[in-house]
């Protein structure tokens, strides 16, 4: 009999997992907490080459090729405008909301049902599977449940009520899309600038718009209501002050941005002790959220989806399939999380740390390129036809 999966979360991991399971011969339904079109996600993200190759296994690479822009080059400068490093690695940068919508639409086209306004409140094992309960009073039953419900995963709390909280990494995020500004550079390059008091990144879209983000340091984790109370103009004023005196187009780009995005805290999960239990399993940020500084969050979610599909295809016992999935994924994703933390720590090092960073980073990056030291991250490939052992 064909298995049926209940997938909680309709971001990236959820729809991709549904399509991976479908290819593996497993039916699924996706349950998204927010109403249709209510995601309102204005930020952008980057899919690294390993994530793009994982999408290719599900015939989704053409889908993302129609969104955003290629960003295969990275240039890093300091607050004086000195070039510290240049690296190259295939990647594609796209708006998060566009990717969400494209993946959902494609999942539906392939026969996956997506339900909106379905916030998970509880789940429990039944004689033959699992039952999910939602805030609107509705219920659903399946053979297994996949928690693709992100950083604040309800599924994670159900699997392990004692699961640790996400770790705040000392950085805030904001950004936007600037219009009518002639920023130095060319399309296809991610420009990263270590300002004296704030990190900044920008990309030039082929149509001229400048996509940017900033990471103001904050030792204090700000409550959501406090962040929500900061107006776009207050963010603008704060950022203009943070970048005053730094070399680079930061202030011009910020001034040319009609709507600065609401700020948010940056978190990661160094280790989530339990990934599965009672016919439930975690994927993506629910299992191993990494800070944006890794550049790998979306790619890890896609890889998870494909590997879980293989495990459930090849290992008939659900619990053993979940164990195989964790065995294949945990070491890699936790290494990525650690790399993201190291990258983020360099964004707010203080004056002494900045001096050392500017001295050492060019040497380190040359060695990274020479030795291909990040091959473990970017050269990872999944073979769909390779069987998974229990």
PLM region spans:
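Short helix-loop capping/hinge motifs at secondary-structure junctions, enriched
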Residues: 180-186, 249, 314-315
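Conserved N-terminal glycine-rich FAD pyrophosphate-binding loop of Rossmann-like flavoproteins
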Residues: 36-54
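Conserved mid-domain beta->alpha element of the FAD-binding
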Residues: 7-27, 31, 146-147, 174, ...
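Flavin-binding catalytic cores
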Residues: 226-260, 318-319, 327
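Active-site substrate-recognition segment that forms the wall
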Residues: 188-224, 243
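Conserved N-terminal helical subregion
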Residues: 1-5, 20-22, 48-160, 164-177, ...
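Conserved Rossmann-like nucleotide-cofactor binding loop
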Residues: 13, 36, 152
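C-terminal helical "tail/cap" subdomain of flavin- and related membrane-associated enzymes
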Residues: 1-3, 66, 81, 252-255, ...
């Amino acid at each position: 009999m064909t298995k049926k999966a209940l997938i909680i979360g309709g971001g990236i991991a959820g729809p991709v997992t549904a399509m991976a399971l479908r290819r593996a011969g497993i039916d699924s339904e996706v349950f998204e907490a927010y109403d249709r079109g209510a995601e309102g996600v204005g930020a952008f993200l980057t899919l690294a080459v390993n994530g793009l190759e994982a999408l290719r296994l599900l015939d989704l690479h053409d889908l993302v090729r129609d969104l955003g822009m290629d960003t295969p080059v990275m240039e890093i400068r300091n607050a004086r405008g000195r070039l510290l490093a240049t690296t190259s690695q295939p990647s594609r940068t796209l708006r998060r909301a566009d990717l969400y919508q494209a993946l959902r639409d494609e999942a539906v086209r392939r026969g996956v049902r997506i339900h909106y306004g379905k916030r998970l409140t509880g789940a429990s094992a039944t004689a033959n599977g699992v039952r999910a309960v939602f805030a609107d009073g509705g219920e659903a039953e399946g053979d297994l449940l996949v928690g693709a419900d992100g950083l604040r995963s309800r599924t994670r709390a159900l699997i392990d009520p004692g699961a640790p909280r996400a770790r705040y990494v000392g950085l805030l995020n904001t950004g936007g899309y600037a219009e009518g500004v002639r920023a130095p550079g060319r399309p296809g390059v991610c420009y990263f600038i270590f300002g004296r008091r704030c990190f900044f990144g920008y990309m030039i879209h082929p149509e001229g718009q400048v996509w940017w983000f900033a990471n103001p340091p904050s030792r204090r984790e700000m409550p959501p209501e406090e962040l929500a109370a900061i107006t776009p103009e207050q963010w603008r004023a704060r950022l203009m002050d943070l970048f005053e005196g730094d070399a680079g187009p930061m202030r011009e780009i910020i001034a040319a941005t009609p709507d600065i995005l609401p700020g948010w805290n940056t978190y990661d999960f160094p280790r989530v002790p339990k990934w599965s239990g009672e016919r439930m399993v975690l994927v993506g940020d629910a299992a191993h959220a990494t800070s944006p500084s890794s550049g790998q969050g979306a790619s890890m979610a896609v890889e998870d989806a494909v590997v879980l599909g293989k495990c459930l295809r090849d290992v008939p016992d659900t619990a053993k399939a979940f164990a195989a999935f964790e065995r294949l994924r945990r070491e890699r994703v936790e290494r990525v999380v650690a790399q993201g933390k190291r990258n983020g720590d360099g964004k707010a090092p203080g004056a002494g740390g900045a001096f050392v960073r500017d001295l050492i980073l060019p040497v380190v990056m040359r060695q990274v390129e020479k030795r291909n030291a990040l091959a473990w991250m970017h050269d990872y490939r999944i073979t769909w036809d390779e069987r998974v052992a229990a």
